[in-house]
Design a protein with these regions (language model features):
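N-terminal "domain-start" segment
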Residues: 1-84, 89-92
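Amphipathic alpha-helical binding modules
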Residues: 94-135
Length: 135
């Protein structure tokens, strides 16, 4: 079984140097929410665990749609762009391989916190987070 520390390293290494590109580009962060093995993965619990306010706008979001653009190779991509696509595909694969019950939540409307959540092998909730900006 992969430990929480090993999982953080695996996902951190895979996302290191990648920026989620919207109107502003943001890196990824990986964390484990300790003692959450009996906590349901839902909007309310994630908001509470990540110190959001009950009035914060939060929505469910589709995991595959979130990564549909960064994992799509285009004919006009440079060699560096193609390498980045491969890295994104690897990150998506590692998330799917290592986490169960994957759910994505977006908090906010313009400056958006994105939480990719799932159940780590330990049972705790793992979070891969980034930010988006949409005007």
């Amino acid at each position: 079984m992969t430990s929480d520390a090993e999982l953080i390293k695996i996902l951190s290494d895979a996302s290191s140097g990648l920026l989620y590109q919207t109107e502003l580009d943001y890196p990824f962060e990986v964390l484990i929410l300790e003692n959450t093995d009996k906590t349901a993965i839902n909007k309310e619990n994630i908001l509470k665990l990540l110190k959001g306010l009950p009035v914060d706008y939060i929505e469910d979001y589709d995991f595959d749609f979130l990564f549909s653009t960064p994992t799509l190779e285009q004919y006009w991509h440079s060699e560096n762009d193609k390498k980045r696509v491969v890295r994104y595909r690897n990150l998506v694969s590692l998330i799917k391989k290592n986490l169960k019950d994957i759910k994505v939540f977006r908090k906010g409307k313009i400056y958006i916190d994105v939480y990719i959540t799932g159940r780590a092998p330990s049972g705790n909730i793992a979070v891969v987070s980034t930010k988006q900006m949409q005007t």
